[in-house]
Amino acid sequence: MTATRLLLPARALQQPEWASLDELKDVLLSLEAKPPLVDATACADLTAELGRAARGEAFVLQAGECAERFADANPETVLAKADQLHRLADEFTDTSGLPTVRMGRIAGQYAKPRSNPTETLSDGTVLPVYRGDAVNAPEPTLAARTALPSRLLLAYRNAGNTLSTLLERDLGLAGRTAPQRTYAGHEALLLEYEQALVRPDADGGRYGSSGHFLWIGDRTRQPDHQHVQFAASVSNPVGVKIGPRASAEEVGTLVRMLGDRRRPGRLSLIVRMGRENIVPHLTSVLRALGDEAAGVAWICDPMHGNTRTNGAGQKSRAVDDVMAEIEGFVSALRAHGLRPAGLMLETAHRPVTECVDTAAELASPTPLPHYESACDPRLSPRQARQVVARTAALL
């Protein structure tokens, strides 16, 4: 390994400008020597469960933070998040009759792609944007916003602590209830971190040991770029976010690069098009894919395409927009003889007020009072239950 960047910036978008490449080299060497965070068998088990969801025999519920904070990697907070996920999944199963695959946006969701590389404060100061705790800190100072490679080691440690807590929870409940595994997924954004944690699997291949399920974001899904090539190189189940700008040709290329008909749960397409775009754009993609559409798991992300700015200048989302996208997603798939495989939500385990119930409420100039997110707005526990219950009723 050299002190130069491992990846060409033009081929790997949304990568930090690290403060020291020499320190980055040392950090990556340290990560390469560490044990895997998850084992390959669990990743293979998740692939099989996603395959069942793709066939309509189960449903994936993925919920959790937009951007995890290191400070939340303590047993009390992790258990609260896991309990919320499992309650939502139980409610979904009770209503729909479908088994639920339970996956958190957890134990690795420490990095976020951003629309702009900088942020201008009210006094005119220009700072690097907050990119997640694995890169920098949200406090509005230059020191906090500096991208420090040492934070990758903190990401590994906090992810490990979180996964240990989840495993202890699952094992502790196994003797008292039907065992329900908590899988962990995150966006595989920081490619040097992800690559440093690639390990051999039992079949002679390689898997990303940073999490059970890894997805590529809508901003980094270019088929000829490094994020997609990384996803193609590992045996984990992987997802790709598909937004309204994704052409049918691009989606087809991604399916052929990342899909595997021998393993139907290998590829999930996570659709995030917004309530206005979901039916026409998804219909266009499905028509172009034809029979290939049946070889992937179709998951709805009804959050990211419906982010707005409210009258107080805060980013927010409306539950009625979220539900409209879910309804359009389900109807478009059914029109093509396909089954919805899952739902990805950004949720808080505390009673925050970051999303509103109706779009009309977004016009209010009064700031939402309990706004705690480090990045995007999350559903409160009440709102999450409402969305899950209404989705279950659709199915």
Where are these regions (language model features)?
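N-terminal basic/disordered segments at the start of proteins
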Residues: 1-57
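Glycine-rich, charged/polar anion/phosphate-binding loops
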Residues: 45-47, 224-227, 254, 283-285
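A general structural signal for short secondary-structure junctions and capping/turn motifs
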Residues: 50-53, 91-93, 230-231, 332-335
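Active-site-facing alpha/beta catalytic cores
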Residues: 57, 67-68, 72-274, 317, ...
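Short loop/turn segments at strand-loop or loop-helix junctions that form parts
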Residues: 61-66, 103-106, 300-303, 346-348
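Short glycine/proline-rich, acidic loop/turn segments that cap or connect secondary-structure elements
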Residues: 349-367
